UniProtKB/Swiss-Prot annotation:
Keyword NADP among UniProt keywords: no
Listed name of the protein: Siderophore export accessory protein MmpS4
Residue intervals passing through the bilayer: 2-22
Naturally occurring in which organism (per UniProt): Mycobacterium tuberculosis (strain ATCC 25618 / H37Rv)
Family the UniProt entry places it in: Belongs to the MmpS family.
Length: 140
């Protein structure tokens, strides 16, 4: 009878010892109660200084342009048939803002400019037939 029962007994002992070992390891590692660093109290948070972003498209007087830009939420917006010079002022309290503007006009010259808090961060002028230009500020 011992000849047939020794294998199940060894398996039972191995399972018991393995279970005990796993129980001890789980009790030793990861058992501490770590403090939570997240806090839902937003009342004391100070807003960032507002950022003032200005998009400008310029060219010869009377130029008509199609303009695409990112708004304050980085959503694409489009203005068709804008008479130049054209500008848009955006104010946000976000920590960072991305500025992107693209324009194509019906004249041989067109330019764009992005200013952040009064400082020119991107400027470009294009001189070609049906001129196309873009300006990009990755982080402001």
């Amino acid at each position: 009878m011992l000849m047939r029962t020794w294998i199940p007994l060894v398996i039972l002992v191995v399972v018991i010892v393995g279970g005990f070992t796993v129980h001890r390891i789980r009790g030793f590692f990861g058992s501490e109660n770590r403090p939570s660093y997240s806090d839902t109290n937003l009342e004391n948070s100070k807003p960032f200084n507002p950022k003032h972003l200005t998009y400008e498209i310029f060219g010869p007087p009377g130029t008509v342009a199609d303009i695409s830009y990112f708004d304050v939420n980085s959503e694409p917006q489009r203005v068709d048939g804008a008479v130049l010079p054209w500008s848009l002022h955006i104010t946000t309290n976000d920590a960072a803002v991305m500025g992107n503007i693209v324009a194509q006009g019906n004249s041989d010259s067109i330019g764009c400019r992005i200013t952040v808090d009064g400082k020119v961060r991107a400027e470009r002028v294009s001189n070609e037939v049906n001129a196309y230009t873009y300006c990009l500020v990755k982080s402001a």
